[in-house]
């Protein structure tokens, strides 16, 4: 049995977008993607249709694959503060199925009116007619739109396509368990135990690309496997 003095690392507060750095497979970086959003605003930017198309960029991928995390970190990068809370600072607009669509539309139009870019998490929650309105409102103002979606939206280009593989899984687990002070071999032992556990294998098989749900499912594994941590979520 592993011992730890930390709270359960799989509780919801540790899995909020932006808490874990996005994992890039190669040499790409947050700053490079942010530059693509900034590009049409700088000197020497292309003119004509290609420039307008570049103003509409989308992060595309399945549920729980890191889209919101990437957009949150892009928000921090664009604001020049990687420690900022983009939600409380109104750095981006987050939409859910239960969101008030009219209120959200007003918030987005307000951002387009006053800012150089507008970031929208959950673009597919906006009705198609409202999507047309946002594009038409942003285009003549030169405002960059960057959104998350499960499929590439009409009139958008792909900024990034999120994928989940073994490398991403290990990165996320290592970040979550970085502060675990385990007596039986340290964090690496905990990571190995988790990744080799039947519970993890079953969860990954069940949730496939949705890594977020697999991580939530490991809350019970941690509670049953790890001693001496607060049993409150």
Which role does the model predict for each range below?
Residues 1-53, 217-233:
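A short, basic N-terminal segment
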Residues 51-72:
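Walker A/P-loop nucleotide-binding motif
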Residues 72-79:
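A conserved segment at the C-terminal end of the G1
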Residues 81-113:
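AAA+/P-loop NTPase substrate/partner-engagement loops
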Residues 98, 108-137, 144, 148-151:
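Conserved P-loop NTPase "ATPase switch" module shared by AAA+ and STAND
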Residues 152-164:
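Short regulatory helix/loop adjacent to the ATP-binding pocket of P-loop NTPases
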Residues 165-197:
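Conserved small helical "lid"/interfacial subdomain of P-loop NTPases
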Residues 192-233:
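Amphipathic alpha-helical "lid/sensor" segments that cap RecA-like P-loop NTPase cores
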């Amino acid at each position: 049995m592993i011992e730890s003095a930390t709270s359960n690392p799989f509780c919801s507060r540790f899995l909020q977008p932006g808490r874990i750095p996005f994992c890039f497979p190669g040499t790409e970086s947050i700053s490079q993607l942010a530059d693509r959003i900034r590009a049409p605003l700088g000197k020497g930017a292309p003119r004509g249709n290609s420039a307008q198309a570049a103003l509409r960029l989308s992060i595309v991928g399945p549920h729980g694959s890191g889209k919101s995390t990437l957009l949150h970190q892009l928000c921090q990068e664009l604001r020049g503060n990687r420690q900022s809370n983009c939600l409380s600072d109104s750095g981006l607009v987050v939409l859910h199925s239960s969101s008030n669509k009219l209120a959200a539309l007003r918030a987005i139009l307000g951002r387009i009116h006053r800012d150089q870019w507008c970031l929208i998490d959950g673009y597919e929650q906006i009705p198609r007619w409202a999507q047309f309105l946002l594009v038409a409102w942003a285009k003549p103002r030169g405002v960059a739109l960057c959104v998350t979606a499960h499929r590439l939206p009409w009139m958008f280009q792909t900024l990034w396509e999120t994928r989940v593989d073994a490398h991403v899984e290990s990165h996320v687990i290592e970040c979550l368990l970085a502060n675990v002070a385990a007596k039986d071999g340290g964090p690496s032992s905990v990571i190995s135990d988790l990744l080799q556990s039947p519970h993890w294998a079953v969860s990954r098989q069940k949730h496939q690309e949705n890594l977020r749900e697999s991580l939530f499912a490991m809350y019970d594994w941690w509670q049953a496997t790890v001693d001496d941590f607060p049993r409150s979520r």
